[in-house]
Amino acid sequence: MNQVWNIARKELSDGLRNRWLLAISLLFAVLAVGIAWLGAAASGQLGFTSIPATIASLASLATFLMPLIALLLAYDAIVGEDEGGTLMLLLTYPLGRGQILLGKFVGHGLILALAVLIGFGCAALAIALLVEGVELGMLFWAFGRFMISSTLLGWVFLAFAYVLSGKVNEKSSAAGLALGVWFLFVLVFDLVLLALLVLSEGKFNPELLPWLLLLNPTDIYRLINLSGFEGSGSAMGVLSLGADLPVPAAVLWLCLLAWIGVSLLLAYAIFRRRLT
């Protein structure tokens, strides 16, 4: 485990030196506070509205940002080391490829987790201090669940980045594929489901369609953050299908964890077969 931690510490140190942690934390804090106070501006309201509305807006924002940030953070984790000649050096040490991959995942995962905690935690603290009459128990429960699920979503896409980075031979190829993965899961997947609904006039296997949401970690993430507020009415579009999904919230959490585990195993299998 010392070898794993040494690699993780190196990745964390690189993130601090490159200002990744500071930049992500600041971005999350500014956007979260802005959404909390200006999220209802389109309807003519300024100021904090409600915890469910704030969490729903933040979850929608994080659905776009977390995957992109995670992919940009780790797309060159393997191919970048290979191009720079440091991967060959690493493999001369008594280190297994699994240890290298796990160390990178721990280091990058800590960067994302700390950024989420600092950025969104500051927003929760600002609401607690500045909004009169807010229910603190519900506020910290909702933000705690939101921050944990956001971190897990980021970890899913870190694992995706390792899969891509282990598969290609050039950083530019990894960057292009990373953007393609982001488009697929964040934009294209839901559009395809909506197209199925529209073209079939709502008749496309209504029992199967809600289960298809589990094939997209971003949809699982949004369902987790919308499911805890009964009657909030925040689920729109494809996510409204989640109301027909006969599974408890715990299963959604397990599905998100499964995405991380399966993706890391796939990344390891690809990395193990990679020739340096």
Swiss-Prot record:
Bilayer topology annotation: Multi-pass membrane protein
Entry keyword Glycoprotein: no
GO MF terms held by the record: ABC-type transporter activity
Transmembrane annotation, as ranges: 20-40, 55-75, 111-131, 146-166, 179-199, 251-271
Keywords assigned by UniProt, alphabetized: Cell inner membrane, Cell membrane, Membrane, Transmembrane, Transmembrane helix, Transport
Quaternary assembly: The complex may be composed of an ATP-binding protein (NosF), a transmembrane protein (NosY) and a solute-binding protein (NosD).
Name of the protein in question: Probable ABC transporter permease protein NosY
Name of the encoding gene: nosY
